[in-house]
């Protein structure tokens, strides 16, 4: 009552600081949340027997590792640090892991034969490690069929089968004593150019689990060669763009191969010859030799120092010695620097200006594309503080129109850092209307526009009707007035006169003022009009 079951996953979480230290010793970094996700969700889906609570079984760990390291689109590079740390916990278990780790099988030749003893007592229910203690059942003794004369046994893994036509000596009569067969012999591979790995113990003879991981290590404690498989090289070449098309992606692939496989000098040449063209390879090697630094830490052009650090001919580096491994580490670092420098195209600012933010692209993703364009098409490093102003201006001008306009109107824009601009752009981007909201707004604006147009049409029609009504009213008024005048006789119009016709006598030759028939006497006084008064 009250006890909790301890599992490998919960145990690692309880000792998380130790796990991080072990990961740091492996030159990797692990996160707690992703550790739990990979252990309980991702790796059980590989169908190699990984339990949801984790395990320290090396066979299962190695099969998961083979899935993680699978080249091409089926691999999981993001899970490499985590499975490598699990493997380190199983190979070199700390004290808190040892109770969960099954003891390594001893060589069969050193195990003395003993008859099966009585069954051990069953574990109690309160034991926290009951899952790790195998149940031992009493088995009936088997018939002994092997001879007791110490005759040689044939190792079917290393020896040829006997001739069926020959018959061996007759078996002696009497009780037969059982003997164990000798352990299988593991012949180390030949000196083939390939990856470097430390040796591990050979698999147990009774193990039926197949290890899909291609790197098997001997038990002599020496580093051995294991070649790149042709399928690996084929997948790497066909599943990735060429170096000229996308140098960044191919450089990232080669960097992961250099980190995880630790290739030798010959391996690197094979890798470059497969993934690069001849011209690309020469450019990479030239840039790598330029990156060699002297004792003062500055780039050097001394042939002896350059050839010592990055030789073009096959060196005699012994990978089994610390000095040889240090040479290989430096060579791989210089090769990676050469890939990065050779991947830069000639300066082309037009390519940088052509990088614009997509309609649904986040500002962070757009900034990464912009920085990649700076690295690829310019000699400038976008992470350099001296180039922050140029990158910021490009970020503002080449952002989406709505984001760029609002960024330009920010107060105190000169004091804003690139990080501040990205945060402001993220706020603007997150406040954008959704496609549904945009469709609704467009529909609403269209309806309002149609309503305004309809109202304007109605207003124009009413104005046209009023104007037509006024004109019709004037016309009708004129017609009615003319008809009324016709009924009343109308006004008598004066007859038309000629230019020299008198208006008084109607004779021609003089005007009315000179008409002799017109009386000339003074006019009589007009009679005064009498006004009525109050007295009248």
From Swiss-Prot:
Ranges of compositional bias, category Basic and acidic residues: 432-464, 484-517
Task: Give the GO cellular component terms, alphabetically.
Answer: host cell plasma membrane; membrane; viral nucleocapsid
- Coiled coil ranges (UniProt) are 436-474
Q: Where is this region: Disordered?
A: 139-216, 432-536
List, in alphabetical order, the GO biological process terms annotated in this UniProt record.
virion assembly
- Where does the record place the site Cleavage? 129-130, 213-214, 476-477
Q: Any signal peptide, and if so, which residues?
A: none
Q: Where are the zinc fingers (CCHC-type)?
A: 500-517
Metal-binding listed as a keyword: yes
Does ATP-binding show up as a keyword for this record?
no
For the lipid attachment N-myristoyl glycine, which residues are annotated? 2
What is the protein name stated in its UniProt record?
Gag polyprotein
């Amino acid at each position: 009552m009250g006890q909790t079951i301890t599992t490998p996953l919960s145990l690692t979480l309880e000792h998380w600081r130790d796990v991080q230290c072990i990961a740091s010793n492996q030159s990797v970094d692990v996160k707690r949340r992703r550790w739990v996700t990979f252990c309980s969700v991702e790796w059980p889906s590989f169908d190699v027997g990984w339990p949801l609570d984790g395990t320290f079984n090396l066979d299962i760990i190695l099969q998961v590792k083979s899935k993680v390291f699978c080249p091409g689109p089926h691999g999981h590079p993001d899970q490499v640090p985590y499975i490598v740390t699990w493997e380190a916990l199983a190979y070199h278990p700390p004290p808190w892991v040892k109770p969960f780790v099954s003891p390594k099988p001893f060589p069969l030749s050193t195990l003395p034969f003993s008859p099966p003893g009585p069954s051990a007592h069953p574990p109690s229910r309160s034991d926290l490690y009951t899952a790790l203690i195998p149940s031992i059942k009493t088995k009936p003794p088997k018939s002994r069929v092997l001879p007791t004369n110490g005759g040689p046994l044939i190792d079917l893994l290393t020896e040829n089968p006997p001739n069926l036509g020959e018959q061996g000596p007759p078996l002696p009569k009497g009780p037969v004593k059982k003997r164990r067969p000798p352990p299988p012999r593991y012949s180390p591979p030949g000196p083939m150019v390939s990856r470097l790995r430390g040796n591990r113990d050979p698999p147990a003879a009774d193990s039926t689990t197949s290890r899909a991981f291609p790197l098997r290590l001997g038990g002599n404690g020496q580093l051995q060669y294991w070649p790149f498989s042709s399928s690996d090289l084929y997948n790497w070449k066909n599943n990735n763009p060429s170096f000229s098309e996308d140098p960044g992606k191919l450089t990232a692939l080669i960097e992961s191969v250099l980190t995880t496989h630790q290739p030798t000098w010959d391996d690197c040449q094979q890798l470059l010859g497969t993934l690069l063209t001849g011209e690309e390879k020469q450019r990479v090697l030239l840039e790598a030799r330029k990156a060699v630094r002297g004792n003062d830490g500055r780039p050097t052009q001394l042939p002896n120092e350059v050839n010592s650090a990055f030789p073009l001919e096959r060196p005699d580096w012994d990978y089994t010695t610390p000095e040889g491994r240090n040479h290989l580490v430096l060579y791989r670092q210089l090769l990676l620097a050469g890939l990065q420098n050779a991947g830069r195209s000639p300066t082309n600012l037009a390519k940088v200006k052509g990088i614009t933010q997509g309609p649904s692209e986040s500002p962070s993703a757009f900034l990464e594309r912009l920085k990649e364009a700076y690295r690829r098409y310019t000699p400038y490093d976008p992470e350099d503080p001296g180039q922050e102003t140029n990158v910021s201006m490009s970020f503002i001008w080449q952002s989406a129109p709505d984001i760029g306009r609002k960024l330009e109107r920010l107060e105190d824009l000169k004091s804003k850092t690139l990080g501040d601009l990205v945060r402001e752009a993220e706020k603007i981007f997150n406040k954008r209307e959704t496609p549904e909201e945009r469709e609704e707004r467009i529909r609403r604006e269209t309806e309002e526009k149609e309503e305004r147009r309809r109202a304007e049409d109605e207003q124009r029609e009413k104005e046209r009707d009023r104007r037509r009504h006024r004109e019709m009213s004037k016309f009708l008024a004129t017609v009615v007035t003319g008809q009324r005048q016709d009924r009343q006789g109308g006004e008598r119009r004066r007859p038309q006169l000629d230019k020299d016709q008198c208006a008084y006598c109607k004779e021609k030759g003089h005007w009315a003022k000179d008409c002799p028939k017109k009386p000339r006497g003074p006019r009589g006084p007009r009679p005064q009009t009498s006004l009525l008064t109050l007295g009248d």
